[in-house]
Amino acid sequence: MDRLTVRELSPEENKVLVRVDFNVPIKDGKILDDIRIRSAMPTINYLLQKRAAVILMSHLGRPKGTGFEEKYSLQPVVEVLEGYLGHHVPLAPDCIGEVARQAVAQLSPGRVLLLENLRFHRGEEHPEEDPTFAAELSSYGDFYVNDAFGTSHRKHASVYHVPQAFPGRSAAGLLMEKELEFLGQHLLHSPKRPFTAILGGAKVSSKIGVIEALLSQVNNLLLAGGMGFTFLKALGKSVGNSLVEESGIELARRVLKLAEQRNVRIVLPIDVKVAKACEPGVSWSETLIDQGIPADLEGLDIGTKTIQEFCKIIDASATVFWNGPVGVYEVPPFDQGSMAIANCLARHSSATTVVGGGDAAAVVALAGCTSQVSHVSTGGGASLEFLENGFLPGTEVLSPAQD
């Protein structure tokens, strides 16, 4: 690590402002998966053992940024947090203003305070419009710790601007350190070979940077999901009514040419599950890509032959990175391809298997294989940006490590 870590701080009896990522899925006021809260506990517990007063700040969802919205309140997080800590955690009704300042002032060493959703204020996502937002957050702590790997690819106030107010006193949390070291060592600097990356999801354009970066790293690149259909169309295949990013077709051709130059094998679906609509109980069938998808049908998942081919390549790999589902996993049976990949990764215990957060992490959790994968990242977009650039905006602004 070339940045200061939380273990190098002296937080005793001081207030520590900690950016966590508690952006958890919530339904009817209940948290569906608390992995992000669980993942932050080592840093929180470490600071409490050091007798620090811990001020947690996070966003949740995408509120309008015009004030409190009940459905985006961090209130459901409090109960889970209290369960892990074993003591009461107050939730400040706001993250700035007099109520927040009072809550911070009353916080004792060895206790935790959670500030309300940062994104209730426009200044979080648009710091240039309201510089006072970052300035007020900065005033709460003696030290700053970033443990929100999943948000550190964004130049938001709490991630990018606040730490700059703590020269020599801003550090990476334990989760952040673990993410950067694992991804850096096993994917960027010295991956065991053969190295295979599997990319799903909808758009080529949003992943073009990481695709081009991976082409200088991997031996095999498996492409599926909506992105796969864009590549298939670029090769002149008939993809029917499947999701295609028309503006990405030229990008796909560029990638195919670059892969050839770099001797990287790109593998696309050879068959797909097709249906007239993506809805539960719909009639579906499997179609070979070479036979073409009929105009009134859309591809919604990879087919049996593609599953077999993808799993064969995974089994022969020493390092595997997966980001993005290969089908519409929320609607069975179009979850079969993604589930098969999750199970294949779990079985392949001799390889280093890395799941790049987001929907792929959700699939692995649904398949019950999270513990059998080498590393499930807490950041989808962040893991991709780290692979693309080798750094994240939110880590670059932390204090340099001391020699």
UniProtKB/Swiss-Prot annotation:
Entry's localization field: Cytoplasm
GO terms under biological process: gluconeogenesis; glycolytic process
Superkingdom, taxonomy of origin: Bacteria
Enzyme Commission number, as recorded: 2.7.2.3
Catalytic reaction(s) noted: (2R)-3-phosphoglycerate + ATP = (2R)-3-phospho-glyceroyl phosphate + ADP
Pathway field: Carbohydrate degradation; glycolysis; pyruvate from D-glyceraldehyde 3-phosphate: step 2/5
Residues that, per the record, bind ATP: K207, G299, E330, G357, G358, D359, A360
Record Pfam families: PGK
Enzyme class: transferase
Chief place where the protein resides: cytoplasm
Keyword Cytoplasm: yes
Binding-site residues for substrate, renumbered to this chain: D21, F22, N23, R36, H59, L60, G61, R62, R119, R154
Keyword Acetylation annotated: no
InterPro entries reported in the protein's UniProt record: Phosphoglycerate_kinase (IPR001576), Phosphoglycerate_kinase_CS (IPR015911), Phosphoglycerate_kinase_N (IPR015824), Phosphoglycerate_kinase_sf (IPR036043)
A GO term from the CC aspect: cytosol
Alphabetical keyword list: ATP-binding, Cytoplasm, Glycolysis, Kinase, Nucleotide-binding, Transferase
Quaternary structure, from the entry: Monomer.
HAMAP family in UniProt: Phosphoglyc_kinase
Family to which the UniProt record says this protein belongs: Belongs to the phosphoglycerate kinase family.
PANTHER family per the UniProt record, alphabetical: PHOSPHOGLYCERATE KINASE (PTHR11406), PHOSPHOGLYCERATE KINASE 1, CHLOROPLASTIC-RELATED (PTHR11406:SF23)
UniProt-recorded name of the protein: Phosphoglycerate kinase
